[in-house]
């Protein structure tokens, strides 16, 4: 049996007690994003997903694409967002959603360590196929960052998404 990380253990315990989880998404780098995270944490969020701004967020819809562009236009970068996230200290798990180009460009180990140093518990990399996630997942695991994989409800059982990741597994609808 694989080891459950703190993020997954926390979320499972809450779900197992019959609770629904509230995990809002906030695009890092937008005006007031840090205050939005603090407010969500203070008002019962179980965790928060921080979107790292990216120039071509093809896996996102138009609202998140626009938010990412606005953050970039304001000067945000993954590094500035993670630096700010490291100072949040909100008492709930933080995860990031980022594109594989960001991970690859920094290097798996370096990026995973940067997330860990910023207090990030998990990472969603939606454009990283499960079959190619091994090097990233190994580096993330070594840094104590849980890899959160996404799956469509129609994904075949043989993809075994739940067996090949740590963190929570998101099912898209």
Feature-to-residue mapping (PLM):
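Glycine/small-residue-rich loop that forms an oxyanion/phosphate-binding "nest" at active or ligand-binding sites
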Residues: 62-114, 118-120
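Active-site rim beta-loop-alpha module in soluble metabolic enzymes
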Residues: 165-173
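Catalytic cores of alpha/beta
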Residues: 31-43, 155-165
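Catalytic beta/alpha-barrel core
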Residues: 72-76, 96-98, 119-132, 145-160, ...
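Glycine-rich, proline-tolerant flexible connector loops at the mouths of alpha/beta enzymes
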Residues: 46-78, 130-133
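N-terminal amphipathic alpha-helix/helix-capping segment at the start of soluble metabolic enzymes
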Residues: 1-23, 84-85, 89
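Conserved, mostly hydrophobic/aromatic
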Residues: 24, 40, 48-51, 115, ...
């Amino acid at each position: 049996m694989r080891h459950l990380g703190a993020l997954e253990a926390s979320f499972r315990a809450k779900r197992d007690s019959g609770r629904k989880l509230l995990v809002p998404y906030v695009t890092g780098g937008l005006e007031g994003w840090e205050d939005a995270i603090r407010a969500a944490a203070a008002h019962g969020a179980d965790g928060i997903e921080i979107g790292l701004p990216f120039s071509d967020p093809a896996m996102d819809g138009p609202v998140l694409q626009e938010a990412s562009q606005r953050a970039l236009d304001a000067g945000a970068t993954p590094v500035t967002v993670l630096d700010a996230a490291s100072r949040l200290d909100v008492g709930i798990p933080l995860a990031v959603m980022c594109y594989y180009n960001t991970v690859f460009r920094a290097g798996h180990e370096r990026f995973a360590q940067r997330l860990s140093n910023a207090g990030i518990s998990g990472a969603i990399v939606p454009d990283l196929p499960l079959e190619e996630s091994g090097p990233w997942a190994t580096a993330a695991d070594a840094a104590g960052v849980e890899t959160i994989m996404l799956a469509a409800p129609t994904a075949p059982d043989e993809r075994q998404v739940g067996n090949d990741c740590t963190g929570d597994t998101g099912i898209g609808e």
